[in-house]
Amino acid sequence: MDRDLLLGLSDEELSARCRLEFCRGTGNGGQKRNKTSTAARAVLLEDERFAASDCSERSQHRNRANALWKLRRLIAFEVRCAPPVPPPRITCGVTHAEYPRNLAHMLDVLDSCSYDHKAAAALCGVTPSAFLKLLRRDDALWEKVNSSREALGLHKLKCN
């Protein structure tokens, strides 16, 4: 699996590499949500361990896009590669299309430094405090980094 290729695909291209399933949503929302197939689930055909679903919207189209976004984030969180040399500068926001790839690269750098944020910051060419701000802006990333640090016997990072 070429992680960076998958993370850079458009929704249409990624959809072609997935099995898309649609079903009725659950919970509040009334007739539109409970009586039509608005919930979406995307399963990566190359590796069916990677699957994401969404039923937060009343639109099947938006739920499909959200499920694909969640799938990209899952791939970025779980698939580690050697960090790119030199590591890319992380400049985009959490809703930008390039964010999952940047997220994966940040985790690659952290993994290569045994989750030492100061060493990872030096590799990325930013200060440790700036690197922590990049990590802190995404709650799921912050939790992933802290759980990985704990697994290695390191203390949790604290937010300012």
Model-identified regions with their sequence ranges:
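Helix-turn-helix DNA-binding helix
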Residues: 131-132
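Ribosome-associated translation termination/rescue signal centered on the conserved GGQ peptidyl-tRNA hydrolysis loop
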Residues: 1-107, 111-113, 124, 136-139, ...
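Short, Lys/Arg-enriched C-terminal cap helix and immediately downstream tail that follows
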Residues: 143-145
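Short helix-boundary/capping micro-motifs
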Residues: 115-116, 120
